[in-house]
Amino acid sequence: LKSEMAKSEAPTLFQVNGPVGLANWKDYCMDLSGSELYSHLTSDDFVLKDGNAVQGIAYVIETYGIIYNKTILNDYCTMDNAVISSVDEINNFATLKAVADDIQSRLDEINDKFGYDLQGAFTSAGMDGSSDWRFKTHLANLPIYYEYKDKGITSTDAIEGTYLDNYKQIWDLYITDSTCDPALLSGKTGEDAASEFALGEAVFYQNGTWAYNDIKDNEVADEDLGMLPIYIGAEGEENQGLCTGSENYWCVNKNADPADIQATLDFMEWVVTSDTGRDALANTMGFVTPFKTFEDGYQSQNPLVLANDEYTKAGKTPVSWNFTTMPSEEWKNGVGSALLEYAQGTGDWDAVVTAFVDGWKTEYDAAHAE
């Protein structure tokens, strides 16, 4: 984007990923508060503001959690000495761990009884570049979310790491009750995890609504797909919903030619009001959007999206996407490296804490140095 913005014909429409991205580009962003696009939003929760100026508008809302195979889990529930009799009983970390531990210890028994080819309770927690973001960013959101919630804040220059013991116990569960030896995680990919789940080799798979396209048309039918919140053992998590937010905000370059700006505003309006545009976003791309114009028949039929709707209707509190406040990509990489070293047995958890807490302060200060 830096090189594009430096050109004589710089883009009129661009996107940022959240508050940190906006901080780098806010001097280019037109105030969209008077736009038709803004008037179609269902809530101000889906904008990025600088003061009262609306500088970014989210165009896709995504959700992630622990995707699960309903059929396998329901079959497990019928077994003698199963630790639950219904999936609905999984509403905290202790129960999730008890179920995963039991499934992991009874893989052969489950496979023999039901004809499955289960290799583990959870898919591999691959830490190569195609998969590590699930843990250094999306999973790391949970301890940040609960710390922010306790303090009543939405960002910080210095994270304390209050919930890093919780982060450790969910990470331990992922790498222990798994299809894969932890020593092999550095070479495991996002495609490996998607394939393991899609072929019925694992019951649980941390990912989001976007993963539907990787799963569908395989062994797992749409009606077999469910999603659980990522429980980490925080107080009150029985009322927790899925992690919902956006990393995709449209911004309009206020320095562009006025005719280009108007054409861009007209285009965005067309995307969210025309049949062609709405069909492309809702059906071809499978997006959930934050616009009122999609409420008349342009809602995604992605079963993972529908799972989120069920939590919302049940009054569960969605977990906000606070990872957009992570200080830098370097910070994420530091946490990811420490997680991998810990999983492989070549590093300890203290190194994860150091990367998380000290690394945050270092990277935040570097980004905000005058």
List where the protein language model places each region.
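Extracytoplasmic/periplasmic substrate-recognition and gating elements
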Residues: N52, N218-G286
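Conserved C-terminal helix/tail region of periplasmic/extracytoplasmic solute-binding proteins
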Residues: D275-D279, T289, T293-Q299, T312-E370
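Hinge/lid segment of periplasmic solute-binding proteins
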Residues: Q15-N74, D112-D117, R134, D224-Y231
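Short helix-initiation/N-cap motifs at beta->coil->alpha
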Residues: I90-T95, L184-L199
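Extracytoplasmic/periplasmic solute-binding protein
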Residues: G51-Y59, Y64, A94-S155, A202
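Glycine-centered hinge/linker elements that transmit conformational signals in sensory
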Residues: A100-D101, Y146, D150-G187
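A local structural motif
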Residues: D80-V87, D157-I159, Y174-K188, E201, ...
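Conserved N-terminal structural module of periplasmic/extracytoplasmic solute-binding proteins
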Residues: L1-G21, L37, A234-G236, A259, ...
